[in-house]
């Protein structure tokens, strides 16, 4: 007959009849409710209880990295999107080598528990982790938050560490200063803005104690310059205090000359820099930008001006399928603003030089569009030329010259095996082959080389694990400098009185950095024993004005103009025209001003040929 597995259960109706009806055959249907399992998985081991200071440890790496931890602290600040926060132990451990604060990262908070607010003292369970990118220093943080419990509310913030009189020479000393403050509240007062708000919402200040002459800070320009200390040593100004906007709904827009009267924030580390993420309530003293022109000049004018100008990504409207230019292709409105600003810059700030040595254009046609804008406004006769390069984005150096005042006799691009090895597709980073223009200026034959060397963007950050930082791009710039110097030597060997200029964005300082010695790119260009010297006209500029670019708050020279002995005799003066690098990046979208038409300041040389 039919098979019934053994098993019965008593009917739970509360009535006992002492018959078979008091029982029911048990169900053995193998549905989810009746399927045997191995049982629940064992719970994970409990998290390791630890104070924030124990999680941070007294070095760069947390001794608890990779472990689930449980800690407590007071919430001091949230990121603007509310997804992450900073937490600080209000009492600390009294050890100056351990941080009392920590960043809690991540994509929201657990479904169980209460969402905290600033001032809440919380218990939190998460995983200790070191966030690190490339050769930058690591950031100790908590991630994968499992639990948050609010223990109390309305707690006052911990006292903020004052940021004043920071280490001002050696980067390792700066790292040693900042690391024990990671994640903690810190404060600046009466600080001087030395770099404008950039496109990432960051700006840089110096404490009042550090903003003194002789430290790299120049009160004339209110900026801090990278400095040559001699023997390959460089002052990279570790006393810089960067302020970011990750905790703000919108960035704080400032420029050199402004002051931060008071600002408190959490110490963070991102993109190779220690920085403050501001809490609400900052007090600022700001001023409006000047009325154009902002450029100033010293010395006589001469009869001819030659200016080198990196115009920063002047691209046309076409996304070229064979170039990596999708991220650089503007909208029609963006291109209109760019051309309007650059045309105003050439007319108002550059004062219509005879020759502009240009970098970062996509092609001759877009450069000619710029020339046509200037011609329509000023009645000049600017003509453009450039040659396609090996650069993956397709940017080129070029010339824009006023054909009503000078003539271009010849233009060509350097070529050959050495050029290929330094600039071409087989080079470490395909780049921009030099462009040579031979100009007739007042009856003088002037040979100008337009250059755009490999950038420093792939080098180690200053605040990195390698000290001194490794500069891997330096090798290629040396190759590029040697190619250019070899061409100059050929010209001067044929005619020692030739008037030769090497100009452009050379992406390097006019002095050696740690480990370079005397064999740095600018020294190669200037020439060694037995070579005719080239003189860098940046040396004629006043110390306070000697910068063409601002990076991470450090004002520095990247753009150069070197001249042969015969051409040096015709020089009257040289000036950097400061109307871009010192101004906030937001002005790049303002067509009503030439300020921030690009990110580099032009370098102008003035000559007397007549």
Task: State where each predicted segment sits.
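Extended non-catalytic accessory segments flanking core domains
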Residues: 17-21, 25-341, 376-377, 385, ...
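Divalent cation-coordinating acidic motifs and surrounding scaffolds
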Residues: 1-5, 13-23, 29, 106, ...
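Predominantly extracellular/luminal cell-surface or secreted proteins
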Residues: 1, 11, 88-90
